[in-house]
Amino acid sequence: MLHIKNLHKSYGAFEVLRGLEMNVNTSDIYGFLGKNGCGKTTTMNIVSNIIPKDSGEINFGKENCKIGYLPETPSMFTYMNGYEYLDYIASCCSYKDDKKKRIDEVINIVGMAEGGKRRIKGYSRGMNQRLGIAAAIFDHPDLLILDEPTSALDPQGRAEVMSIIKNLSLIHI
């Protein structure tokens, strides 16, 4: 599904990625491990087309690959509730199917049926991550990229978010 070959990226004289090669198959869960500044987020941003690569090849195995992306610190409109936020996401991606039905589906997938009606301003970090994942999967992406989805979560929150991610890989989003 995702094939990266000889990927390079530098910031001035600082070479972050030097010939990265990797293959990710459908339903696989991959994680990047490494110290700060080694290129983990840069790689995700290049694959997500947020920043350009210097050189190399990225092949998704199909044209028009949809990517769902959750940054390390998701930006959300705190004056909205979860349902309103996902309605906004649906508008951004020009979602054409039954929007309300899909909002209910993703809210349930991430286990937020009750919390979706509360204002985002009152969400815990774990609830923010769940809503961010719901937004990332909203338009049925072919590839889901999550940048540190469990950082700053307590052990229970980490386990819950990892369970959601594992289940998403099983249902192919």
Question: Would you name each region that the model predicts?
Answer:
Residues S48:
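Helix-to-loop junction immediately C-terminal to a conserved catalytic motif
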Residues L144-E148:
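Catalytic Walker B motif of ABC-type/P-loop ATPase nucleotide-binding domains
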Residues I171-I173:
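Conserved small/polar residues in nucleotide/adenosyl-binding loops
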Residues P52-K66:
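Conserved ABC transporter NBD signature motif
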Residues D87, S91-S94, D98-G115:
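Conserved ABC ATPase "signature" region
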Residues P155-G157:
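Helix N-cap at the start of a conserved alpha-helix in ABC-type nucleotide-binding domains
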